[in-house]
Amino acid sequence: MPTPEQVTPNSHRIALGIEYDGSTYSGWQKQKFPQQETVQQYLETAISKVADRDVVVSCAGRTDAGVHATCQVVHFDTEIDRGTKAWTEGVNSMLPRTIRVVWSRAQEDDFHARFSALSRRYMYLMYRRDTQSAMLHRRASYFRRELDEVSMHAAAQHFLGEQDFTSFRAAGCQSKTAMRNVMHANIYRRGGFLIFDVKANAFLQHMVRNMMGSLLQVGSGDKDPAWIGELLSLQDRSLAAPTALPDGLYLVGVEYPQVCALPSEISQPDLLLAI
């Protein structure tokens, strides 16, 4: 069977926009042991049923266990000619309710969900109150202490630009380089939530959660905003704060060249903000 990058003469490439609640999954990537349920595992099984043969998908960004996505993008190759509804409604009928295909688009053979992407955007949602919320369990991160969003936003500006993010990568990160280009990094409040909104050309493993973990130390008054700049310069993960929980992290956008004609985001009802 050809890999997603080895297109046969009779095959064509399809891109899908996916959203999922990652609460119960062991991340995006298919694992060695099938009892570790992943988003990729369920999606490939569903697409393969519609395509009448085994299908392998490639994604824009591999999310960790417990991380959600409102705009994941994948691609796969198939020799079966199906309409748009087959790749959306047909695949959705085979998926658990926590995973949904939102759109499908035919693409040129050189399109790649990961390597064609210009940027990815994540949002991290937090809330503060005396007790944890039952309604927001695993959908937003809980922090009991008061946070100074002005200091956190000032600290986040140290992330901007192209630089080495060794201090904010996971110990097991397999990327060959820690250089990444952060295009925006904003902290703001909306509807009772504190939101970290960050966009970059690509992200290292655990990078957003590690950034958030250190920003929380600034927001709680334990560190000054300039500390983030110092961490970047020192390039030592052990000096930064612990990794923030995955609960409030969402992949919310993937940007591609205009020629691909793909949505960069998926419109969402502001459910969390309406509660």
Predicted regions and their residues:
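Structured-RNA-binding interfaces characteristic of tRNA pseudouridine synthases
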Residues: M1-I275
